[in-house]
């Protein structure tokens, strides 16, 4: 729905990401991430990572969102080796087109 390259470019602008749902805020905190980290995940996405588009709400408003799944190898220090981690990201652009509303950012469960 949203041109991925445009969304990725927008992540480089300060203040352009908004964790839009309470659950998203909790999931991002659980990962030990901040909005810069979420922006980094979005910049790693490719068109092949696209999953689907769906309507999402935050309890007050609705947004048309694109959902992606990002798979990457990450070194887990406690285990001393790399594991394949799968992230699920769902986002929309705000009405102005200058704000990315992050609806979901969590690992697969």
Q: Where are the predicted features?
A:
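Compact soluble domain cores
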Residues: 2-69
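Short, solvent-exposed aromatic-acidic interface loops
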Residues: 102-109
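Short, surface-exposed linear patches
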Residues: 41, 90-93, 109
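Short helix-capping/linker segments at secondary-structure and domain boundaries
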Residues: 35-36, 97-99
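Functional cores of ribonucleases/endoribonucleases
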Residues: 48-97
């Amino acid at each position: 729905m949203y041109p991925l390259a445009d969304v990725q470019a927008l992540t480089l602008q300060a203040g352009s990401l908004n964790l839009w749902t309470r659950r998203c805020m909790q999931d991002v905190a659980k990962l030990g991430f901040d909005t810069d980290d979420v922006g980094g995940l979005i910049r790693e996405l490719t068109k092949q990572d696209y999953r689907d588009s769906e309507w999402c709400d935050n309890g007050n408003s609705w947004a048309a969102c694109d959902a992606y799944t990002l798979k990457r190898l990450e070194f887990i220090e406690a285990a001393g080796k790399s594991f394949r981690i799968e992230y699920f990201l769902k986002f929309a652009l705000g009405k102005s087109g200058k704000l990315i509303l992050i609806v979901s950012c969590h690992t697969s469960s």
